[in-house]
UniProtKB/Swiss-Prot annotation:
Protein encoded by which gene: astB
Family label: Belongs to the succinylarginine dihydrolase family.
Protein name, as recorded: N-succinylarginine dihydrolase
Catalytic activity field: N(2)-succinyl-L-arginine + 2 H2O + 2 H(+) = N(2)-succinyl-L-ornithine + 2 NH4(+) + CO2
Gene3D superfamilies hit by this protein: Succinylarginine dihydrolase
Source species: Legionella pneumophila subsp. pneumophila (strain Philadelphia 1 / ATCC 33152 / DSM 7513)
The entry's keywords: Arginine metabolism, Hydrolase
EC top class named in words: hydrolase
Sequence positions that bind substrate: 19-28, 110, 137-138, 216, 254, 366
Transmembrane segments: none
Length: 448
């Protein structure tokens, strides 16, 4: 049976802006208060989807969340009509208004953790939407992400959805950005590598903690997901992220490593006690595992964070054994990083034989590269057929969405623009039309 890795990219919302809301995300902090271009951001994302679809990959999308989040404004004490809520928040707590307007749901690698049916005891695809409690602007996404995934993957014969993990610091979960799956091919059972930044409960004296920036994913959360998803404990590894890397801006593991099938591309300073982690992978692998370890002399952690090399997508084209690296254009612009990539492509010892550079500047300036923008969902033929078909991409749908973006999206957004109530109504009109395009029904709060 055919098994595909469906890439579900986040469609960038109309309120994409730069507010520096994410501690430990250096690009987000450095570009705070810059002027954004939501239309360009959305079109860059659509072009990414188009390129991967035209390469022969299965491609879908997750729609933007409703913004501003009026319910969150209400919870934070801003009452009245929507216009009054927005005005009060802008005057007294503009940073909270910015959080309520955040378009960060576009980074769907944080939407959930997904387990392939070939890995689970009940042979179903398992989903746990991430609670994202580390940041207010991300935490507000959790419930709607769960609702979306339950709608899109609604057939209980094939799909199993779990509740959010408890909303506590002890079970802080950031989704698939801290999960990798290594396997002979997507059709074979795999090794599930869960990466955490801290252990909260019990004895953790042998592990260090970051000092400058917070660790977001807990070991307790990763362990709970592995249990809930009915994964074989013998095929699961829990690895601690290098705290020194976190302090250099590696806020998720997908900023410092990327896996695809039997290939693991990783920086040598990605993990705490990295030699042991890689030995575990080799020991558990019943397939020819290829580990490509990039040294700090080749590329420093800081350079990896600046260019998001490891936040590239590593993909296998249909009916081919070779792989393509889908990298941000920032990698091409950095001579040292480009030289490293050229070396990877030229090396016959690994299956990566080409690279494709993407312009994702709008997302990159907020700390999100190609891998941040997609949630990987392994599906066989039956599972693919059983999911909601309206969000699956083809060129016709991409053309419709491009026209929709041109119709509704502004070409410039500054922080003071968030005080304009008209932006709210522009967003609602756009989302109302989008649900019809994607056949999602009345899924947004304002539609009920």
């Amino acid at each position: 049976m055919n098994v595909y890795e469906l890439n579900m990219d986040g469609l960038v919302g109309q309120t994409h802006h730069y507010a520096g809301l994410s501690s430990g995300n250096i690009a987000s902090t450095n570009n705070a208060l810059s002027i954004s271009n939501p239309q360009a951001a959305a079109r860059q994302g659509l072009e990414k989807m188009r390129q991967l679809y035209n390469m022969g990959l299965k491609q879908g999308l997750l729609p933007p969340h409703q913004r501003p989040n009026l319910n969150l404004l209400y919870q934070l004490g801003f009452k009245g009509t929507p216009s009054e809520q927005i005005n009060k928040a802008y005057k007294t707590a503009p940073e909270l208004l910015s959080a309520c307007y955040s378009a960060s749901s576009m980074w769907t690698a944080n939407a959930a953790t997904v387990s392939a049916s070939v890995d689970t005891e009940d042979n179903k695809v398992h989903f746990t939407a991430a609670n994202l409690i580390s940041n207010l602007h991300r935490h507000q996404e959790a419930d709607f992400s769960k609702k979306l995934l339950e709608f899109i993957f609604s057939n209980s014969d094939y799909f199993n959805h779990h509740p959010l993990l408890p909303k506590s610091m002890g079970t802080s979960d950031e989704g698939a950005a801290n999960h990798n799956r290594l396997c002979q091919s997507h059709a074979h059972s795999g090794i599930n590598l869960f990466v955490y930044g801290k252990k909260v409960l019990g004895n953790h004296q042998f592990e260090q903690s970051p000092i400058k920036y917070p660790a977001r994913q807990t070991k307790e959360a990763s362990e709970a997901i592995a249990r809930n998803h009915l994964l074989n404990p013998e095929r699961v590894i829990f690895a601690c992220q290098n705290p020194l890397a976190i302090d250099q801006g590696v806020f998720h593991n997908d900023v410092i490593s990327v896996a695809n099938e039997h290939v693991f591309l990783v920086h040598e300073e990605a993990f705490y006690n990295q030699a042991y982690v890689l030995d575990q992978l080799r020991e558990k692998a019943d397939f020819p595992l290829v580990i490509i370890q990039i040294s700090k002399e080749q590329i420093s952690v800081s350079e990896a964070v600046d260019t998001y090399l490891f936040n590239s997508q590593l993909i296998t084209l249909p009916d081919q054994k070779n792989m393509i690296l889908i990298a941000p254009a920032e990698c091409q612009a950095n001579l040292k990083v480009k030289t490293c990539i050229d070396g990877l492509v030229a090396d016959p010892q690994n299956p990566i034989n080409s690279v494709y550079y993407l312009d994702l500047k709008q997302s990159m300036r907020n700390g999100g590269g190609p891998a941040c923008l997609r949630l990987r969902v392994p599906l066989n033929d039956y599972e693919l057929k059983a999911m909601h078909q309206g969000i699956l991409i083809d060129n016709d749908l991409l053309d419709i969405l491009d026209k929709w973006v041109l119709k509704y999206y502004r070409t410039e957004l500054k922080i003071p623009d968030l005080a304009d109530p008209q932006l709210l109504y522009e967003c609602l009109d756009a989302l109302d039309e989008l649900t019809q395009i994607l056949k999602l029904g009345s899924i947004y709060p304002f539609q009920s």
